[in-house]
Amino acid sequence: MRHPVVMGNWKLNGSKEMVVDLLNGLNAELEGVTGVDVAVAPPALFIDLAERTLTEAGSAIILGAQNSDLNNSGAFTGDMSPAMLKEFGATHIIIGHSERREYHNESDEFVAKKFAFLKENGLTPVLCIGESDAQNEAGETMAVCARQLDAVINTQGVEALEGAIIAYEPIWAIGTGKAATAEDAQRIHAQIRAHIAEKSEEVAKNVVIQYGGSVKPENAEAYFAQPDIDGALVGGAALDAKSFAAIAKAAAKAKA
């Protein structure tokens, strides 16, 4: 049975005070909660502080990051490597987010190379896929998702998805307040799983597929009730301890 994962992407938000307060608040809210893995991806500058805060609290919260480079060292100004992330305890690394694809011109092929390098370094890629509003309106949702997935599958084999996480995030629902219905999200998740199953039913059966896009405490239960939605990649609601914990609790309850 797939184990649900709820991950908070803090994006470009935070301060030293906020990191400590939010993580301590999460630890308190999640006390006694089992059956769900909870992860956070703070901005790179705060990963060290987040690790120290979680370690001091004896927390089970998983530490992640929002990006990684294709190199472990060298003349690559402004980048951070998988080796550096590992040294600070970050294990779950978001790649392929639509904001990286759009604002940093990251192609499917480039994201696939990041995926391979993270796996090579023993880290867990959280591979974001999803379509724009125009692509959604044109009925191209699954074609886009398949293309983004196949950039990994066709270069590394479907087995590369073992132990990784896929996050389906329709771009038109990220930070907009608009969200795909639970039924629509389930339909796409099922199609994503079926696409993977064309190469390996075993990998498809076991891979965790999160939904992302304006997930809130008010709609989380409906998403997690769907059989192919295995958690969430959460943006805005992850910046509030009570809201994020409520989403994690909904996942634990639905998948028990």
Curated annotation (Swiss-Prot):
Signal peptide: none annotated. It is found in: Cytoplasm. GO terms for cellular component: cytosol. GO terms for biological process: gluconeogenesis; glyceraldehyde-3-phosphate biosynthetic process; glycerol catabolic process; glycolytic process. Substrate binds at residues 9-11, 175, 214, 235-236. GO terms for molecular function: triose-phosphate isomerase activity. Its EC number is 5.3.1.1. SUPFAM superfamilies: Triosephosphate isomerase (TIM). Belongs to the triosephosphate isomerase family. This is Triosephosphate isomerase.
